[in-house]
Amino acid sequence: MPPTQAESVIKNIIREIGQECAAHGEITSETVVAFMVKAVVLDPSNGFNMDRTLVKTDVQKLVKLCVARLLDNKNPSLDTIKMQVYFDMNYTSREDFLEEHHRVLESRLGIVSREITDTRACAKEELENLYRKIVSYVLLRSGLGSPTDIKIVREATAALQSVFPQAELCTFLTLSKKDKERQLKELTMIVTGIRLFNRDCGKGGEGIDDLPAILLEAIPATTHHIDSQLQIAQEQAFRYTAIIEKVTNNPLMAKELQPYMLKEALYNVRQYEIFLQTVLSDIITCAEEVELMTKQLAAQLEQLKMTVKSKTAVPTSQVFPIFIALASLWTSFQDETVLISVLSNLTTNLELFLGTHDLLFPEKVMQGLLDGVIVKTDMTRIEEHLEEKVQLADFRVLEWLFPETTANFNKLLIQYRGFCGYTFAVTDGLLLPGNPTIGILKYKEKYYTFNSRDAAYSFAENPDHYINLIKEKAKKNAELIQLLELHQQFETLIPYSQMKDVDKHFIKPITKCENGTQTDTHILPPTIVRSYEWNEWELRRKAIQLANLRQKMTHSVQTDLSHMRRDNASQVYPLKEVGTQSKREGSTRVPRPQIFIAGLRGGQSKTTHGVKINLTRAVDET
């Protein structure tokens, strides 16, 4: 059968089942009907062949079985399926919810934004009308009051005029559409910050709720309510578990209590407990965020007061960023308020799927079943086998993980949501919490925990056998597919909320072990820096010395002839001792010159007559 034809047949079957239920006064959503169709087809006791095309008789049988199960209001299994479908359709993660919430707000404001950005106003009345639309847009986007309240409109208009006078509309109209949208968002943030600051100063704040105070009151109340509901659900689960353990050991009693659907009731309350824990985790995150934002809000307001004080005018570059930060914080408060409201309503609506417990198991019936039974909590069961551990020497092929040898031990995705797979398989559906400290079995890239060491050893002998038993049990009780997170084995029944968690199945364990390494004493040659100083004061002393030298001047004495001199370099040969010797010795003597001048002293006559007399002896006379 082609895919399109098969889809058409399935839609017709779902529509027919819905009409049959409506005829009997039971209004059922198409999602629940579709899930029930898949659950009935999966159940091997109904005799449907997944590989064979459905004939008319098969369709009639399928419709009849689905209608019968959907009209059985005393079946805890039906309530569990409805609870799972409701939670899947109404719960999203914190990040996805806030993203969708902001997207819805943007889509609602799109009409008002387009009226402002697409206008071509020119006349005075048109400009005034445009300004009023901007005020309405600011109020709608900020969520601080109704745009129909005259007091709120006046306050918002006054705040807007202080940063965006009406005279600037002409400039605003000349901007591009994207710039207009950006400026509208920026004006909204600034006006919101101004109104919040005025409210804190006691000068305004009309229509602004005290969100921090509301959240500080709502979060503890919601947390207390969920804690109380969680405690009731856990106590009920502990009682059902104790009764089922008693029944398992008594075959005659098990036959008598088979119509009471004890295990289906246990699955219902366990699923409710898991959903409450999910919601409680989100609310705790909200409480942490609100506590942090409250401190930031007080700090921003105090900074703004210190900046403004009693000044008549403050630069926009100083106050506008603080106004925008205030508005952003207030938007986060609004997000947390909406999220808390949604989670609170979700918790309240989950209680509607617990009605069968009072019908099937009133207090008198429970007291009779609990006669002589010791009710144990999950923690008590874990503590009973706390000292037991799997011995690695007993297993050569299988891999076991322990908290001492695995760094991300608490982050591993345990199969069957942490319940003991062996106990569930051998008792035909009893849910007992696994104890990770005994050891986590890693088998085919999946991780399993057990409530005792004996259960771990038995499961390890033939894991595939017990895994198949659990899968067959899940086919009979379709609510176990989501309760035990068996989506990979039944891909057609993966809920939308679980699709984004597929990556969690691929978390690898980070094992730890003791290793030793040895290196050479000195791989590299030593490099000693003589100028290195470890003393801080010595470094300061050198810094001061350099600073002082920087301010000093060098003096020199130069003359007119020496100021052009420069350094020169010359090269000489080194000195050495040398001796010479001649063949003979000789000497000469020259006569000493003796020349005299007579008559220099003068005489009787006035004229001096000098006579030069050479008395030098001849050379040959010496």
From Swiss-Prot:
InterPro entries: FAP206. It is found in: Cytoplasm, Cytoskeleton, Cilium axoneme; Cytoplasm, Cytoskeleton, Cilium basal body. Keywords: Cell projection, Cilium, Cilium biogenesis/degradation, Cytoplasm, Cytoskeleton. Its main location: cytoplasm. GO terms for cellular component: axoneme; ciliary basal body; motile cilium; radial spoke. Transmembrane segments: none annotated. GO terms for biological process: axoneme assembly; cilium movement; regulation of cilium beat frequency; regulation of flagellated sperm motility; sperm axoneme assembly. The keyword Cytoplasm applies. Disulfide bonds: none annotated. Pfam families: FAP206. It comes from the Eukaryota. Belongs to the CFAP206 family. Essential for sperm motility and is involved in the regulation of the beating frequency of motile cilia on the epithelial cells of the respiratory tract. Required for the establishment of radial spokes in sperm flagella. This is Cilia- and flagella-associated protein 206. The gene is Cfap206.
